[in-house]
C-alpha cells in the first residue's frame, strides 16, 4: 500500500498550526482538491463521525436497558443477527479481520483530519470512558450513495461497546467444555435427569458412566496429587498440573470439562454402581431384550474390581447374576425359565473358552449374530453353581504382574448369560430370549509403563490393537459411515451386536485421580465422551417367538413345562443335599481329629477348601445352606449318626484293603526274585563259552570279560585278540559258503555260529594286528 505524507498531499507545502495557509493559485488549488478526492483515505472522517454517533445511540440504549438485564443483551444479539451472523457470532478469524480494519481506520482518519486546513477541521468528539470489558459487535449501516468510497465491503462496520461482566457460576478454575454443541448440553441434561431408569432412552444411545477410584498407597508415597474433580455426580473436571519452568506449556488450557450420564466419586459403593448402571438391563433381559455392560480404562484403573469385585464387596457380574436368579425365582410360578451361561476370553487375538480350556475357537456369523463355534454353554439352576463356574473361569484367565499392576488382566473376558422364558398364553407357547453380556476389557497401556521386549509387551501390543479397532468402530458409528470395521479385531466382532445392534449398552469408564496418570485419564475421558454419541437401534419389541399349538399339544406342552419345573426343583434339592453331606463329612473329620474338643456348629465348620467356601457364602446373601444346628429336627440328627457309622465302616474297609495291597506287593517281589534265581541256576556251563561271531554287541561284552581274564586288547580298543583255543570265523564262514558249515548244519545263514572250529586258519588280517606267521 503506498504511503502518502502531508507534504506530498499538500503539494510540498506543510501548514503550521499557528499560521494560516498561504493563498494559492486557482489551478493549483483545483489540483490539490483533485488529489484529496482521489486519495484512498478520503471519507474516513465522515465514517468516524457516523460511527461515533452510532456508538452514542447504542450507549444510551444500553444505559436504559440495564434494568432489563437479559432483555438488553438479547436486543444486541438480535441486532447482530440482522447483519447475517449466527447466534454464536463470528469466528476468531473474522473478529481479527474486523479488529484490524478498526485499528487501521483510526490513524487513517487522523491523517485525513490533519491534511485538511485548520479552518475546515472539526472539533474532536469527546473521549469516551474506557470500558472495563469490551465485546465486538457488528451493526448494519445505511450507506450514502454520494460516498461510495466510504462503504466497506458488505456494508459492515465495527465498534466495541461495554457489556456487563457475568459472575462465574462455579468457583472452579477456567475450563473448556469439549464436544458439546449448542443444544447438546441441554439434551444431556435432560437425559441425565431421566437417568438410567428409562429403558427406551437407553435404547437410543449408549449410556456412559465414569467411576473414579481412590488414590493408592503407591501413588501417595510418590507424592501425586488429585487432578480429577466430580461435581453434581455428572460433571467431571480435569486439571493439568505443570511446573513454572515448563515454558512450552504455560499458555495451554489447563482445565477440561466433561459431562456424562452419571459420575461416581471414589466413595461410591459397588451396590450403588450396580443399581445405577446394570439393574435396568437385568429387567430388560427378563423381558426378552439384549443388554451389554463393559468397562474401559487404563491398566490399574479398577475395571476388574468394578466387574468382579472381592468377597466382601462383589462387583457388577456377581450382583447381576444374583439379582437375575432372584427375579427368576419370583416369576417362576407363571412359566419356565432356563439360564445358560458361557465364559470366554480374547487373548493375543485368539478366542479361548475359560470353562473348558482347549484349542482356540473360531468366530462365525449366523442369523443370531456373531458366535464362537465350539463354545461351551452350561445350564445353571442356582447362584451357587454360577459362582463355581465363574471362579473356575477366573482361575483359567490370563493375569500377569506388570510394573503398574500386580494382578493385571492380559485378556478381554466376556461372560454371556442367556435367559429363555417359556409360557403358555391361550393356545400358543410364547418364548422370550434375552442375552446379558458382561465384559471386562483389558487395560490400555503404554509400552514404557510395562516390561519391554518380553511377553508382557507382546500382550500389551495386542491389547492396544484391539482397543484401537474398537475406537475406530466407535468413530465410524458416530460419523454415520456405511462401513463399520468390525473385522479388524476379534473383540469388535464379538461386540458387533452391542455397539450397532438392537441392544441396551452401558459403558463404565474407570479413571485414576493421580496426576501421574493424567495422560491415560484424559484419553479415557475423551474416548468415553466420543462413545456417548453412538446411536443404537431402538428396541421396540422383544425377542419373542409365538408358536401356535392345538389342544392336545397344549396339554403336552403344559406337562413338559411342569416336568421341567419339577426337574429344576429337584436339582436344587440335590445341590442342597450335597452341601449338607460335605458339611457332615467335614464335621466327622474334625471330631476324629480332636475328640476331646466339643463339636463346632455346622455354620462354622468348613470343608478342606474352608476359606473359599466361607467367603462364597458371604457373597450369596440368599444362600439356603446356612441352617444352624439348633434348628435341625431329630430325624436329621439320626440321619447324621447313620452317616457317621457308614463313614467309619468305609474307613475300616479302606485300611483293610491297604493291608491286603501291601501283602500282595510283597508276594509279587518274592516271586520275581525266585524266577531270577532259577534262571541263573539253569544256565548251562557251555553257554559261558565265548561266541565266535565278532559283532559289536559281543565285542563290547568281550572287552569287559577280557579285562578280568588278562587278554590283550588292540590299540583301538574295539576288537579283542583271538583266543588260542578258539579261533574266529574266517572269510568263508562269514560269507556262509564254508563247506564245514554246510556239512554240519545243512543251510546257509549269515549269522550262523559254527559248532566246530574250522581246521584251516584264516588268512584275513584282523584290524590292528600284524600277520601271524605259520609255525612249521
Curated annotation (Swiss-Prot):
SUPFAM superfamilies the UniProt entry points to: P-loop containing nucleoside triphosphate hydrolases (SSF52540)
Residue ranges, annotated region (Disordered): 1-31, 80-135, 590-611
Domain Kinesin motor per the UniProt entry, residue ranges: 205-534
Keywords: ATP-binding, Coiled coil, Microtubule, Motor protein, Nucleotide-binding
Nucleotide-binding recorded as keyword: yes
Lineage top rank: taxon: Eukaryota
Compositionally biased tracts (Low complexity): 7-26, 593-604
Protein name: Kinesin-like protein KIN-8A
Gene name linked to the record: KIN8A
